[in-house]
Amino acid sequence: MKDVLTKLANANHLRFEEMQQAARELFAEDVTDSEIAAFLIALKAKGETAEELAGLASIMREVAVDIPVSGTDFIDNCGTGGDGSQSFNISTTAAFVLAGAGAKVAKHGNRSVSSKTGSADVLESLGVPLDVSTEEIATLLETNGIAFLFAQRMHPRVKQIMKVRRDLRIPTIFNLIGPLTNPVPLKTQLLGIYREDLLETIALTLHRLGRKRAIVLHGACGMDEASLAGTNQLVLLDQGELIRFSLHPEEVGLSVAPIEAIRGGTAAENAEILLRVLRGEAGPYRDTVLLNAGIALFAEGRVETIREGIERSAESIDSGRALEKLQYLQRMKQQEAIG
């Protein structure tokens, strides 16, 4: 680890293989908290490359639990966090909308680290069980079209690193890495990031990790989700080709709204917002979910345009299918209680 830290301190990039070796040392039982902290801070100061991100993500996936699924026709939608927007859980809400529209969503997430409420926190508040087995996850993906993969259970080797991250209280490479380490083999991904300068880097990383299609976006006002507040920046990865474009909500039939209109709160408050959206309540919360779900459906290739994706997302909510996907997961908890 000393050689790696020296190289990073001198602002030298690591090759893919060097990062893989550094990752193996990072996940070793004898690594110290100070070594982890030094690695995270040095890498953040230098700036992450696609090779470094892919190298670390590949080892995290290598040491993750195995999910016994067949095929690769799965999508994940998530943000990196770290944008400081204090918004509600947009991607978690949108995940149920995607499933209601026919996508198979392997929703990979965690408790809050650098934000107020993580996806695991809000789902737990809704009564969705987090401690499901890998076999149950595979079954849920097949029968319900959506399953939640609790990152702490998927990546047991990262427990010590999570502790250091919480102590640091700043965004690190693991904000970027988390969304890249889904143990389910994904065909498509929608990934929102808090740093516009990393759009192409993350898209190249996804290509290196085998994604066929993906969209990486940076929202208006610095959000890690597509925003109604103004123009959003996106990069489409399509079979290895990168296409950058911008998107304003009015271009796809949605009204502009400030980020203050989608503020979240505690896990319980965000759970209530999620339910209001899935039950059909109109307003900026719903429109933000429609925008993000519509982009994800376009990324997947399920629709030809983002506007069409928004229409399909609205149908998913208004038909009740999105809410049914959540209720299916909630019933698992009830069945556990009954025994």
Swiss-Prot record:
Its EC number is 2.4.2.18. It catalyses: N-(5-phospho-beta-D-ribosyl)anthranilate + diphosphate = 5-phospho-alpha-D-ribose 1-diphosphate + anthranilate. Keywords: Amino-acid biosynthesis, Aromatic amino acid biosynthesis, Glycosyltransferase, Magnesium, Metal-binding, Transferase, Tryptophan biosynthesis. One of its GO terms (molecular function) is magnesium ion binding. One of its GO terms (cellular component) is cytosol. Mg(2+) 1 binds at S91, E225. HAMAP family: TrpD. Catalyzes the transfer of the phosphoribosyl group of 5-phosphorylribose-1-pyrophosphate (PRPP) to anthranilate to yield N-(5'-phosphoribosyl)-anthranilate (PRA). This is Anthranilate phosphoribosyltransferase. It comes from Exiguobacterium sibiricum (strain DSM 17290 / CCUG 55495 / CIP 109462 / JCM 13490 / 255-15). The gene is trpD.
